[in-house]
């Protein structure tokens, strides 16, 4: 069983430990949060998200109340009733066991259920195939590919824009 709660500064140590190197850090946050993440840099990002309105960071806990993941709801766009997910990260020891899929489904349920969004979007770097596979397993589909979104270590990283709708979510989520 997974639980979701708002991010707390005490979660920063766990998040920092999930990121093994600068490449993994860039895949997670596009370098929008300092490396390595600290309570201060995560707190700053939380404040920025809060200032945008519906944005917030969340921590995902396992049955033993141990942090195993995090994500952010970055905005609710009222014009098109869309919520956007970002900063999705899973503890290395939780990967490959379906926990990421469940975490993403909980994030989607929050957006549809509590925020009333009609669609939920996210972006994923093309180099992060495991994450893209997880998002597809949770019901997201590709809508666009952007050739060059970030330069890292001499590489151009493209992104996939992905979306899930209420109707599609109902086929993937038994909530």
Where do the protein language model's features map onto the residues?
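Glycine-rich phosphate-binding loop
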Residues: 98
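Conserved active-site alpha-helix within GNAT-family acetyltransferase domains
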Residues: 101, 126-144
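Extreme N-terminal starter segment of soluble prokaryotic enzymes
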Residues: 1-2
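Acetyl-CoA-dependent GNAT
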Residues: 6-12, 17-95, 104, 110, ...
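C-terminal "cap" of GNAT-fold acetyltransferases
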Residues: 83, 118, 125-129, 148-175
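Glycine-rich acetyl-CoA-binding "A-motif" of GNAT/NAT acetyltransferases
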Residues: 65-69, 130, 156
């Amino acid at each position: 069983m997974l639980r979701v709660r708002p991010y707390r500064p005490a979660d920063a140590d766990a998040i920092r430990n999930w990121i093994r190197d600068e490449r993994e850090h860039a895949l997670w946050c596009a370098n929008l949060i300092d490396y390595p993440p600290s309570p201060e840099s995560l707190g700053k990002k939380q404040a920025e998200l809060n200032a945008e309105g519906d944005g917030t960071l969340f921590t995902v806990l396992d049955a033993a109340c141990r942090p195993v993941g995090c994500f952010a709801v970055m905005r609710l766009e009222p014009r098109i009733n869309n919520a956007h997910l970002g900063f999705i990260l899973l503890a290395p020891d939780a990967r490959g066991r379906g926990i990421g899929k469940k975490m993403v489904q909980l994030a989607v349920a929050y957006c549809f259920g509590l925020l009333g969004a009609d669609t939920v979007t996210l972006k994923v770097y093309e180099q992060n195939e495991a994450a893209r596979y997880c998002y597809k397993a949770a019901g997201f589909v590709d809508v666009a590919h952007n050739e060059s979104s970030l330069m890292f270590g001499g590489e151009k990283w493209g992104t996939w824009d992905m979306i899930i709708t209420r109707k599609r979510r109902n086929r993937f989520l038994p909530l």
